């Protein structure tokens, strides 16, 4: 099984139309390469709120994803599953609820949970088994998924969320 991570400079809810267009092009290129390689997941970070309220950013992201699907269809790309990833900075779109909303709104979308990012956004709240089970319950209650793609590492965080990833040995 192959899982791919798309470029980090994707922003589905940018205030700049040119950045949205570039983001679409990056996702299309990722989907094309993923189809060639038989990737089962195409992981990406949804983007930054860009000083918008999260609800408005979500609305723009959904419109951008609709554009993405139109362009993928026009390109003849049919074999893909995008996997938006939870993000670590509080200025980024991508808390657990937002990832669930994106995935529940579109076919071919399944979540990626980066536990370090969730921990950083929550300013260090993943400390025991029950904390992790809470996330699993949210996913199970809202999405019909058979396979969950996750990342796990240690992370440095501050008031704004993620500062820096560290290796497990650090």
For each feature predicted by the language model, list its residue ranges.
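Terminal, non-globular segments
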Residues: 1-2, 9, 16-21, 116-118
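Acidic/histidine-rich catalytic cores of soluble enzymes
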Residues: 67-167
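N-terminal small/glycine-rich loop or linker at the start of catalytic domains
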Residues: 3-14, 159-165
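Active-site acidic/histidine proton-transfer and metal-coordination neighborhood
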Residues: 12-112
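Short beta-strand segments at enzyme active-site cores
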Residues: 2-6, 39-46, 152
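Conserved radical SAM core fold
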Residues: 8-11, 48-51, 118-120, 157-159
């Amino acid at each position: 099984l192959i899982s791919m991570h798309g470029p980090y400079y994707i922003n589905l809810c940018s205030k700049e139309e040119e950045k949205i267009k570039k983001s679409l092009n990056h996702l299309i290129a990722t989907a094309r390469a993923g189809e060639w390689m038989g990737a089962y997941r195409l992981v990406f970070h949804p983007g930054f709120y860009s000083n918008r309220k999260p609800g408005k950013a979500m609305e723009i992201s959904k419109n951008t994803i609709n554009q993405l699907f139109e362009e993928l269809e026009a390109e003849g790309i049919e074999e893909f599953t995008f996997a938006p990833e939870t993000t670590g900075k509080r200025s980024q779109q991508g808390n657990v609820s937002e990832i669930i909303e994106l995935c529940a709104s579109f076919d071919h979308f399944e979540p990626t949970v980066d536990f370090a990012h969730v921990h950083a956004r929550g300013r260090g709240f993943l400390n025991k088994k029950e904390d992790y089970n809470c996330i699993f319950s949210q996913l199970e209650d809202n999405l019909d998924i058979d396979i969950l793609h996750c990342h796990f590492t240690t992370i440095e965080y501050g008031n704004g969320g993620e500062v820096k990833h560290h290796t497990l040995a650090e």
